[in-house]
Amino acid sequence: MIMMTRFAPSPTGYLHVGNVRTALICWLYTRSKQGRFLLRFDDTDLQRSKDDYRNEIANDLKWLQMDWDFDVRQSSRFDRYDEIFNYLLKEELIYPCYESKEELDFKRKMQLKLGLPPIYDRSALKLTQDEKNKYSERDVYFRFKIDQSQLISWDDEIRGKVSFNAANISDPIVKRADGTYTYMLPSVIDDIDFDITHIVRGEDHISNTAIQIQMFNALKASVPTFSHLSLLYCDDNKISKRVGGFSIKDMQFYELEPMAINSYFAKIGTSDPIVVHTKIQDLIYTFDITKFNQAPTQFNIDDVIKLNPKVLHKMSFSDVKLRLSELNITSPDLWDFVSGNVQKFSDIKEWIRICGQTTVPVINESDQDFIKMALSVFPNGEINQDTWKTWVANIKEKTDRKSKDIFIPLRLALTGISTGPELAKLLPILGRAEIIRRLGYSR
């Protein structure tokens, strides 16, 4: 059987890092098993769901190098949900209820006051037809009837054996009074219809899983394998759209590389060290869903920021060729020169400026004679990365300066700054004429 997973965001906001982690782990899991990946938009909330959010979610996943085999919108499947809803209603596994929100709140408070679990008391099931007729003017909503005699259990790939006493679970609302569906039933119907075999999601869905297992059973369908990830926390707050967790837009504002983000989320929550990679496919080979632990996982944006230069340092020219072409850079020499010295990709713009012909050299008065001498012994012939070694040897024959007192004045004269990448790689980029101009510069 082909493994099939799904990532099911609600297009009611931008992706936050908790979503991204779930999507990545789900994607890595199925790709590591040569499976298929469904992108499902849970947009049954027609008022809050927006096309702009849906497009941004898809674009963010592409930016993170995740692809999908097909996608679906729940809003296109209401007829199918109605079909299954009516079947379960006929089978008396779904039943109508008539309480107002205020009445339900009052019942819940009374149960808590009496020390009882705050679950629905099923009073709607005890109504006579006459009583139902009395409520005919009320808005009706519907619940799925839990089999409360069951012990609901499953083998979770992260949490091991998980069990719920169904007697302590409230019958979930599956259809609201306004006729819209809640998350529960459409999700199960989609998982059945699209042959979902494995579901990866946050531990905040564990109680939903217990309920949905009964829905799978009620529809005589195979129950998928579940993996419940520990939640991400930032400053002791659970990350969510409502808390205001970092979105991909925030990460892009920080100019973080996609693979800094992916390398981080592929390993936090496991005991494995975080190793940076430049391609998402490289993360597939070491992926193991069982390595994720149950402890709360702390997210720290500073840790991702620290990974960013490491990713850039490992990127080859081919990895950034398209982005460099947008800056009119077509030769690999400049990237080879600066890649080990940038914190974010945009830093290269400063090095383009430095390597251009408008840079003003810095030659201290105390170094002027030294720079003149250095220019006089600059090697003839083709300039390559060996030129620097020869040049330094020539200089050392003419001066008793220590290496530091040689390198810093030369760097200032050639770049205008006191730190930076290897000068050996800079010389071929500048060329003889520009080197002579800079070393011979006078105010």
From Swiss-Prot:
Q: Does the keyword Ribosomal protein apply?
A: no
Could you state a single Gene Ontology molecular function term?
A: glutamate-tRNA ligase activity
Q: Which UniProt keywords apply?
A: Aminoacyl-tRNA synthetase, ATP-binding, Cytoplasm, Ligase, Nucleotide-binding, Protein biosynthesis
Record motif 'KMSKS' region, residues:
238-242
Q: Identify the residue span(s) of motif 'HIGH' region.
A: 9-19
Q: What Pfam families does UniProt report for this protein, alphabetically?
A: Anticodon_2, tRNA-synt_1c
Please cite one Gene Ontology biological process associated with this protein: glutamyl-tRNA aminoacylation
Query: Where do the annotations place ATP binding?
Result: K241
Enzyme Commission number(s) of this protein: 6.1.1.17
Q: Which GO terms describe its cellular component?
A: cytoplasm
Subcellular localization, per the record? Cytoplasm
SUPFAM superfamilies annotated for this entry? Answer: An anticodon-binding domain of class I aminoacyl-tRNA synthetases, Nucleotidylyl transferase
Reaction catalysis annotation: tRNA(Glu) + L-glutamate + ATP = L-glutamyl-tRNA(Glu) + AMP + diphosphate
- Segment forming the signal sequence: none
What is this protein's function?
Catalyzes the attachment of glutamate to tRNA(Glu) in a two-step reaction: glutamate is first activated by ATP to form Glu-AMP and then transferred to the acceptor end of tRNA(Glu).
Q: Which family does the UniProt entry place this protein in?
A: Belongs to the class-I aminoacyl-tRNA synthetase family. Glutamate--tRNA ligase type 1 subfamily.
Quaternary context:
Monomer.
Question: What is this protein called in UniProt?
Answer: Glutamate--tRNA ligase 1
Annotated source species: Ehrlichia ruminantium (strain Welgevonden)
